[in-house]
Amino acid sequence: MMKMRKRYFLVLLLFVFGSGAVLEAQMDPYFTALNYPMPRDTMMVMLLSDYQSARSTNDFFTGMSMVEYGLTSRWTAGFMEEGQKIYGMPTTYGGTRINSYVRVFPHDHLLNFTVYGEYEDLNGASLYKMEVSGFGGEDLSEPLALARNTRARTFEQRAILYHDWGRVNLTFDFINETGLDTSGNDFGYTWGVFRQPEYSGMESDKGMGGMAMGKPNEQTPPMLSLQRLGYGIEMMGALGDTNQFGFYWQRQQQYVGPVFSYTLSKNWTAHVEPTSGLTAVSDPLVLRMGIGYSIDHLLHRR
């Protein structure tokens, strides 16, 4: 079954990367925070990789492949596959996530509101930091053979607030994770501030929140140009659980770091975020990297 999943995903990647369609939407600038849905009939493919300096075990790499599609101008659905490689151990498959999110109101407001749901069919060896919640760290603390055969199913919900001022975006996500194999909920949050690059290689358009999603210059800037650079800051952390909600700093993971994007071409955008752990149970360093490719009018070509 796992081999079939990998083959299907490889075929999908080859189809997307082999297409010559024009980019009209950019990869979300954040690694953890989410805001507006994809434009209608737009597909985004993202390849994400983290290097994590572990707090209590060997350092490791994690990877995630993500595909999202704009079903309507307010509704996006997608899926993710992830895995990890701990130094001294074999590469391990982490599981699948299926997500969907909807912008509640059709027009721009002072605070725009998106609701998000995600089904996670993971195993105990899954280490990719899509979010953090609850208490304690997440380094692998049991034998790998046991962890990879331990199912960890979760339903994640997010209430997302955001607003745009020109090219500047402010986003806040409240996260609730409900264990489907355990009782109780774990809570977390993430927020970010990001300034989009002046040049993005896109047609002049606005995102779902009224944000100027890119305006092509009369002349494309050189490949090495500050006009292609976007920058900001992102923070994520835990907020306890059903029995104890709130900030209990030294018992919860908290991370913060600068986030950068660079427009490589009409089709490609690269992202990087060196994130530092702020508490005793956080990993000291998470170096986050990603590359995204987007095509518009996937099913309804102009």
Q: Which residues fall in each region the model found?
A:
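Bacterial N-terminal signal peptides
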Residues: 11-20
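Bacterial N-terminal signal peptides that target proteins for export
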Residues: 2-10
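Transmembrane beta-barrel domains of Gram-negative outer membranes and organellar outer membranes
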Residues: 25-302
